[in-house]
């Protein structure tokens, strides 16, 4: 009868699970094009936010649908701007940004503000938050953040921000992005 110590058994188990968890080398050929990939992930409904900053005192912003909460303690959020975004290359110099969660009332604004070069603050009511970032007065929620990390990820950046301040408005219909279009969701429907 073979006896195994707990430490030896655990060590062997960890070694096996590590060996199984190691992904294959990145030599696989992608069997789909970017349009098909975009259509696939477009089936996942996301919220829409207007990320803002004030580099050199000038308001700048971009529409994102990649906002995610990362951590509660400390409070962290992330979003993913394109690495080719000229707006983000300016905004990142401020080291602070605002996140404005958009609602139904922002649908026309989101469509208008999405193209590069658009005057993204035209017709908006906004004010500077405590940390000096532009915040929409009618956002469903507004967060003031400091950049704590930025990681390259393919053709985008993953930006992580620590939330320093926030405000939440009464519940309203959120703006969502689904299948390549801005849409709204009504509360109370099943």
Regions found by a protein language model. Give the residues of each.
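Basic, polyanion-binding surface patches
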Residues: 2-190
